[in-house]
Amino acid sequence: QSSTVTPNVVVAADGSGDYKTVSEAVAAAPEDSKTRYVIRIKAGVYRENVDVPKKKKNIMFLGDGRTSTIITASKNVQDGSTTFNSATVAAVGAGFLARDITFQNTAGAAKHQAVALRVGSDLSAFYRCDILAYQDSLYVHSNRQFFINCFIAGTVDFIFGNAAVVLQDCDIHARRPGSGQKNMVTAQGRTDPNQNTGIVIQKSRIGATSDLQPVQSSFPTYLGRPWKEYSRTVVMQSSITNVINPAGWFPWDGNFALDTLYYGEYQNTGAGAATSGRVTWKGFKVITSSTEAQGFTPGSFIAGGSWLKATTFPFSLGL
């Protein structure tokens, strides 16, 4: 798996590499690198919080497989962290790539916000990664991001933030939340209509984990709710199981943002994809024009034609 990329350094929990922790390898990496710096993370469970700061550019985390290389921690809001600082892994330096790794926050549903992965890295991409937590699993904080063949699981607002991000060919599963909670797949945070940000889920599969499936009637699950006034989310060309409530989307607080948000659905399939029972908000629409849908593809929305090829990850630019 990792033979196609030659690592600069190797991290191994068992001491057989250059470093025993991922954090040590990141600290030793060059600053402002113009070329890719590959940190191979051998199979193992790495219990640490890892920060890839702004100066650490073009870093790649290369794991041995999503079931074998696991970075895990449990910081959370209930125990005194902020949502922002709770992330098990935070990637900010531009050009960050990760492949064949699990990012996990094990705080659990009762601990409120607890982020597995926060990304503020421009032109960042993730391939064959698992992102596992409960509330606020994946913080797509800012800049242009791409996720391909990833598995994302969580409960409340589990993909959230204000990046321009496309999740393509991903499996996105709601899991059993805490008592009385509703699941929200997304909570997009656009604060101004001029921002070119949004969450796009394309050619993906939205469903439920095995712990939610038998009880999904007790825990309503929605495609998203508007965290900020101009929240923008598009779900297109994806299969949606009956885990998603027929209304599709849920308010944040009364009428807040319902006229100013942009929520679109385009050519989805599956038991949860029917749009006849959807919300009637001014900001919600079933997209019928392929031209409009094209604007949310990786080629248009995140300028994928200029950078995705260099990631070496698979992708498709269009519809």
From Swiss-Prot:
Q: In which pathway does it act?
A: Glycan metabolism; pectin degradation; 2-dehydro-3-deoxy-D-gluconate from pectin: step 1/5
Q: Which reaction does it catalyse?
A: [(1->4)-alpha-D-galacturonosyl methyl ester](n) + n H2O = [(1->4)-alpha-D-galacturonosyl](n) + n methanol + n H(+)
In the record, which positions carry Pyrrolidone carboxylic acid? Q1
GO CC field: extracellular region
Do you know which Pfam families this protein is assigned to?
A: Pectinesterase
User: For the site Transition state stabilizer, which positions are given?
Assistant: Q135
Q: What Gene3D superfamilies does the record point to? A: Single-stranded right-handed beta-helix, Pectin lyase-like
Where in the cell? Secreted, Cell wall
Q: Which residues form the active site?
A: D136 (proton donor), D157 (nucleophile)
Molecular function as annotated in GO: pectinesterase activity
Quote the EC number.
Answer: 3.1.1.11
Give GO BP annotations, semicolon-separated: cell wall modification; pectin catabolic process
Q: Between which residues do disulfide bridges form?
A: C150-C170
Query: Enzyme group, top EC level?
Result: hydrolase
Positions of substrate binding = T83, Q113, R225, W227
The record's listing under PROSITE patterns reads: PECTINESTERASE_1, PECTINESTERASE_2
Record-linked SUPFAM superfamilies:
Pectin lyase-like (SSF51126)
Q: Which UniProt keywords apply?
A: Aspartyl esterase, Cell wall, Cell wall biogenesis/degradation, Disulfide bond, Hydrolase, Pyrrolidone carboxylic acid, Secreted
Signal peptide range in chain numbering: none
Q: What does this protein do?
A: Catalyzes the deesterification of methyl-esterified D-galactosiduronic acid units in pectic compounds. It participates in modulating cell wall during fruit ripening, cell wall extension during pollen germination, and in defense mechanisms against pathogens.
Q: Could you say which protein family the record assigns here?
A: Belongs to the pectinesterase family.
**Protein name, as recorded:** Pectinesterase
Q: Which organism is it from?
A: Daucus carota
Lineage summary: Eukaryota, Viridiplantae, Streptophyta, Embryophyta, Tracheophyta
